[in-house]
Amino acid sequence: MTRRLRRKNIIGGRVAEARKAFNPPLTQDALSGRLARLGIQLDRAAIAKIENNSRHVLDYELKAFSDALGVGVNWLLGDEKK
């Protein structure tokens, strides 16, 4: 079941892709700081788990990732181009 879930969960990969698209790339710690300024407490380890698809993303976290990374929620969900 985990293997099946991983194929369907694209948010983690999109978070990593958006984070690395910054110049210079955002570190997971820097992203954690951006999220904290938005009121979301996720440390580097939690972000790593999300990017590795071993932790689910809650709806309010999805919105915060969108704001912190400057990408649309739909893009994070795989529905549109960056």
Q: What are these regions, as identified by a protein language model?
A:
Residues 1-26, 30, 74:
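A short, Lys/Arg-rich alpha-helix, primarily the initiator
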Residues 3, 63-69, 73-82:
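Short amphipathic recognition helices of helix-turn-helix/homeodomain-type DNA-binding modules
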Residues 13, 29, 45, 59-62:
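Short alpha-helical elements of helix-turn-helix
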Residues 24-50:
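Short alpha-helical DNA-recognition segment
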Residues 35, 51, 61, 77-80:
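DNA major-groove recognition helix of helix-turn-helix
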Residues 46-49, 56, 75:
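Residue-level recognition of specific faces of alpha-helices
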Residues 52-67:
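Short, basic-rich loop-to-helix N-cap that marks the start of a DNA-contacting helix
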